[in-house]
UniProtKB/Swiss-Prot annotation:
Protein name, UniProt field: Long-chain-fatty-acid--CoA ligase heimdall
Catalytic activity line of the entry: a long-chain fatty acid + ATP + CoA = a long-chain fatty acyl-CoA + AMP + diphosphate
GO terms of molecular function: ATP binding; long-chain fatty acid-CoA ligase activity
Organism: Drosophila melanogaster
A matching Pfam family: AMP-binding
Functional description taken from the UniProt entry: Mediates activation of long-chain fatty acids for both synthesis of cellular lipids, and degradation via beta-oxidation. Probably by regulating lipid storage and catabolism, plays a role in neuronal function.
A GO CC term attached to the entry: cytoplasm
Length: 681
């Protein structure tokens, strides 16, 4: 058992101060998991599973058919070399190592190398601007930064003079500018990797490792706030190891040495850290790296190679898979489409029966068996035929999306967590309510704070996975984690009779109308999306207003490289319009706006939005869809009265979506303020 560093509080806002651990929690699981540092956890796993495959990545022209596989034993060797490399360029204890790169094996090597050297890991989204990168490195007191390529190195060149603690920048992949490996402080990963390090440096590494304690900070996760610069969430070694073991214990059907994962979501996000980096260590799972264009269309290629057994994705990832499947289905013959529709209905019916705790009839089982033979080739086509568990989280998942995949024998189990809880605190594994976030993981205590007459209130949680604090922000830390250990999530929810957590929305997103009605927007937004399959994004407006309105964007294709929305409509939008006897295939034709908005030009997008004159049939159909959604409103105050169309789909590239593909509500409000004001005149 790792000795703990003396601490006086359960909270900390400094990289140099440890925290007390809640080892006396009533959970029996918590008492069976001793505190452990991440290097100890890593070493234990690598030695236990030394001959099993750990990491796989594409290396065109080399390896086995263009792919390289690393065993856990080799993984451990690479991490030791990375730790020595970081020491050689001056990484300081209790400083951070910034990692500004797309998912790749070197990300993992740098992470565990930094931790072994007594440093803290601070991931940076590759999409961040130079100023946003500066914020992470300055806040995190970085002494070393690892960057992906020349494009990311250019950001560091622009800001390095303003980072006096930053001693070294290491570039992972070429091509390299002339200054790399020649100017002081700039290195290539390859050259450092080729070095042989002295026995003195190796002794220094062991000495540093021996000083690490489980109750010290191991990682900084920067929350993607909508107001101001992101806050740095401090996670301890114990936070991350405990959350990993808690999630693993909650999952079913784990087969040691036979699990396969695909790493494609940003590793600067806590969900990817737990699912990609740490879960594989807990039961010898093999991680295959997708390329940097995974979310722009190449992910299926990696799935076909890796055949993952467990998958985690934000809803937008599953929406992209759905789009591919819908487009492929549209090209099939009418008889094939009819057969597939009936098969999907039979599979969904069978799954729904099981979730309700009922036993299917003999006829139902036979129908399901036959239907599975029809949908299996589709699962094979997208590389998920071996996948037994599908998790989604990070944003609300629509009922329509869940039903679509349920028909393919894919039950999307929602999970719930935050950066501040070190990852997942609930997992919907043994699904009894498809529309819930499942039940609390082992060692987690949940409660609903000040519930209303429907049992709904703020979700609170406590346990060893509650974060240390926000770096340098004691007031914000005290607002979030109270002295009694309860973390106030800011999320609204309730617990159903079966113990499942149902998420209603965010307290901060709660709309309070001029009449004083409290309205969580997500539920209403999802109802409208269900009624209008042509719509990609819905944003409810109404705070301090007399009535509710919505901004809507229609589904269009996007540029595979830049992620910028295109003028061409998606196949499902075209089909929906065809039923209205509208035959346009481009958004500009449909809304009578310019075809090239020069995105991400906000000025042009706003001007086009203000001048939209859409087809009357389209406006009528949208109005009817909103009326259908309004039938489910629990009061007149929750009915949507007006809507406005936006001139392009929301995206990360144009700023309306954050890195985890959540709508950035404040930004959309500001960008389209003139459009919103027109809805209230």
């Amino acid at each position: 058992m790792n000795d703990l560093k003396p601490a006086t509080s359960y909270r900390s806002t400094s990289l140099h101060d440890a925290v007390k651990l809640r080892l006396d929690e009533p959970s029996s699981f918590s008492q069976t998991v001793p505190p452990q540092t991440i290097p100890e956890f890593f070493k234990e796993s690598c030695e236990k599973y030394s001959d099993l495959p750990a990491l796989v990545w594409e290396t065109p022209g080399s390896g086995n058919d263009g792919w390289t596989t690393l065993t856990f034993g080799e993984y451990q060797e690479r991490v030791e070399q990375a730790a020595l490399m970081l020491l050689s360029v001056g990484v300081e204890e209790r400083s951070s190592v910034g990692i500004l790169a797309f998912n790749c094996p070197e990300w993992f090597f740098a992470e565990f190398g930094a931790l072994r050297a007594g440093a803290v890991v601070a991931g940076v989204y590759p999409s961040n601007s130079a100023e946003a990168v500066h914020h992470v490195l300055a806040t995190g007191e970085s002494s070393v930064c690892v960057v992906d390529d020349a494009q990311q190195m250019a950001k560091l060149r622009a800001i390095k003079e303003r980072l006096p603690r930053l001693k070294a920048v290491i570039q992972l992949h070429g091509p390299f500018e002339a200054f790399v490996d020649h100017e002081p402080g700039y290195f290539s990963w390859q050259k450092l990797q080729e070095q042989t390090f002295s026995s003195e440096l190796k002794e220094e590494l062991l000495a540093r490792e021996s000083r690490i304690r489980a109750n010290e900070c191991a990682m900084l996760i920067f929350t993607s706030g909508t107001v101001g610069m992101p806050k740095a969430v401090m996670l301890s070694h114990d936070n991350l190891v405990f959350d990993t073991k808690s999630a693993a214990a909650h999952m079913q059907d784990i087969q040691v040495g036979k699990e396969s994962f695909v790493s494609y979501l940003p590793l600067s996000h806590v969900a990817a850290q737990i699912f990609d980096v740490f879960l594989g260590l807990s039961h010898a799972g093999c991680v295959t790296f997708a390329d940097k264009d995974a979310l722009k269309g190449t992910l299926i290629k990696t799935f076909r190679k890796a055949r993952p057994t467990k998958m985690f994705g934000v809803p937008r990832v599953f929406e992209k898979l759905q789009e591919r499947l819908v487009a492929a289905e549209a090209k099939a013959r009418p008889y094939s489409r009819l057969l597939l529709a009936r098969a999907r209905a039979a599979v969904a019916e069978h799954q729904t029966t099981l979730m309700a705790g009922k036993s299917p009839s003999i006829y139902g089982n036979a129908k399901y068996w036959l239907a599975c033979r029809v949908v299996k080739p589709i699962r094979e086509m997208i590389g998920v035929d071996n996948c037994r568990v599908f998790f989604t989280g990070g944003a609300p998942t629509s009922e329509e999306l869940k039903q679509f995949f349920l028909g393919l024998d894919i039950a999307l189990g929602e999970c719930y967590g935050m950066s501040e809880t070190s990852g997942a605190i609930t997992l919907n594994v043994d699904i009894s309510n498809l529309y819930s976030a499942g039940q609390a993981c082992e060692g987690v205590t949940l409660k609903i704070h000040e519930p209303d007459c429907n049992g709904q209130g703020e979700i609170l949680m406590r346990g060893r996975l509650v974060f240390m604090g926000y770096l340098g922000l004691p007031d914000k830390t005290e607002e979030t984690v109270k002295e009694d250990g309860w973390l106030h999530s800011g999320d609204l929810g309730y617990i159903d009779p079966k113990g499942n957590l149902i998420i209603s929305g965010r307290l901060k997103e709660l709309i309070i109308t001029a009449g004083g009605e409290n309205i969580p927007p997500v539920h209403i937004e999802e109802l409208i999306k269900k009624e209008l399959p042509c719509v990609s994004n819905v944003l409810l407006i109404g705070d301090h207003r007399k009535y509710l309105t919505v901004l809507l964007s229609l589904k269009t294709k996007c540029d595979a490289k830049t992620g910028i929305p295109l003028d061409a409509l998606r196949e499902e939008t075209i089909e929906w319009l065809r039923d209205l006897d509208i035959h346009e295939t481009r958004l500009s034709e449909l809304l009578n706006i310019p075809a090239d908005l020069q995105l991400p030009n906000d000025t042009a997008a706003l001007a086009a939005t203000l001048e939209i004159t859409a087809k009357p049939k389209l406006l009528e159909a949208i109005e009817e869809g909103i009326k259908r959604a309004n039938k489910y409103a629990i009061s007149n105050a929750q009915k949507v009265q007006k809507f406005a169309l936006i001139a392009h789909e929301f995206s990360v590239a144009t700023g309306e979506l954050g890195p985890t593909l959540k709508i950035r509500r404040n930004i959309v409000h500001a960008k389209y303020a003139k459009v919103i004001e027109r809805l209230y005149k």
